[in-house]
Each structure stands twice: as C-alpha cells, then as structure tokens.
Amino acid sequence: METIVIIGAGASGLACMNELVKTNKYNIIVLEQSNKAARKILASGNGRCNVSNLNMDIKYYNHQDPLIEKLIKEFDVVNFFKQLSLKLRYEKNLVYPYSLSSLSVKKCFNEKYG
C-alpha cells in the first residue's frame, strides 16, 4: 500500500484526507506544524464556521479560472459535510453547522478519523 503524506491539517488537508480514505488504497499521514489541527476552522466565521454558500458562482471570484469554475460546479460542499454526519442549518444562502459552532466541524473529522 502506498503512503501519501498531506502537509497541513487545515480545511483543505482534512478534506483531502477524507477523499483519500474513501478509496481505501493508501496509508495516509497528515503532518501539521502547529499543535492543533483545524486551527483556522475554529476561528472562521467568528467561531460559527460558515461552511458554504448556496449561491456559489465563478462571478464572485477575482479570477475567472476554468478550474475554479469546474470545482464550484462539481464539488458539493453540503453533501461532503452530510457524509461526515455534520448536521447543517441554513440562514439565507449561508450554510453553517447546526450548532453554530466551528468546533462541530472539527469534531466531525475527529469522530470519523480520530
């Protein structure tokens, strides 16, 4: 089994780990410089952690990069968090953890992967 090393246990690193674990093909090691995984997740949205916006569109980005547009269209953030068993709530177009606490986002990764 090949080993993949992910540098950084922030939102992207944890999401990458989640997708790789699903394949069951790799031994995965996540390296984090600080003593806390998901440190910026905990600080995001004044501790509420807005996980997505239902009105995602390339026009809201500074660059009209085709890769970004493709990712916006193909990656379902809401479904991603539902698969991690994170309950969500909606306030207008914004998507938050139901608890309105960024700690819930971190916990959903911890509960699935330790």
For each feature predicted by the language model, list its residue ranges:
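N-terminal Rossmann-like FAD-binding beta1-loop-alpha1 element of flavoenzymes
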Residues: 2-30
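General beta-strand structural signal in soluble alpha/beta enzymes
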Residues: 30-32, 90
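Feature captures the FAD/FMN-dependent oxidoreductase FAD-binding
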Residues: 73-114
